[in-house]
Amino acid sequence: MAREGEGGRGRDREERDSEFMDRLVHINRVAKVVKGGRRFGFAALVVVGDQKGRVGFGHGKAREVPEAIRKATESAKRSLIRVPLREGRTLHHDVNGRHGAGRVVLRAAPAGTGIIAGGPMRAIFETLGMHDVVAKSQGSSNPYNMVRATFDALGRQDSPRAVAARRNLKVSVLQGRRPGGEAEAASEA
């Protein structure tokens, strides 16, 4: 048996959970019609992230709101993805994503811009740890479609290092920098 100060399964889980930030995106009341009337339940959509480039979303259903949120949070922690961030604050490149009739456009932004995004997208960027981004949603405004479209776009995000490795190039060549850089170009002019 675990004594105080030695840890234990429960405490380890609490420490692991403390590294994540979670946001409730949407709660939906649903009804099942039965012989005696209606039986109500709740569905929750939650976004979880570590504010260091990992984020996930989950969906939970239960008869009570807290239980639905707990299930959604656990589901979100199991579906975390890593998103490469430029300078730890924005995207490497502009990207589009879609799910169903929902489409999103995500754009990298200069420092100080902030998170310019509406609804569920803002929760995703805050839990991801992104500080500067401009996002636009088009088509469906259904929170589930918007979240999945945003994750589709974030999944298409590539770091320059990953692109260079895929093309068998050096990152400096990929970004158009040459040995010597601007000093060499200025001496030639």
Swiss-Prot record:
GO terms for cellular component: small ribosomal subunit. The keyword Ribosomal protein applies. SUPFAM superfamilies: dsRNA-binding domain-like, Ribosomal protein S5 domain 2-like. InterPro entries: Ribosomal_Su5_D2-typ_SF, Ribosomal_uS5, Ribosomal_uS5_bac-type, Ribosomal_uS5_C, Ribosomal_uS5_N, Ribosomal_uS5_N_CS, Ribsml_uS5_D2-typ_fold_subgr. Keywords: Ribonucleoprotein, Ribosomal protein, RNA-binding, rRNA-binding. Gene3D superfamilies: 3.30.160.20, 3.30.230.10. Residues 20-83 form the S5 DRBM domain. It comes from the Bacteria. One of its GO terms (biological process) is translation. The keyword Ribosomal protein applies. One of its GO terms (molecular function) is rRNA binding. Transmembrane segments: none annotated. The N-terminal domain interacts with the head of the 30S subunit; the C-terminal domain interacts with the body and contacts protein S4. The interaction surface between S4 and S5 is involved in control of translational fidelity. With S4 and S12 plays an important role in translational accuracy. Located at the back of the 30S subunit body where it stabilizes the conformation of the head with respect to the body. Belongs to the universal ribosomal protein uS5 family. Part of the 30S ribosomal subunit. Contacts proteins S4 and S8. This is Small ribosomal subunit protein uS5.
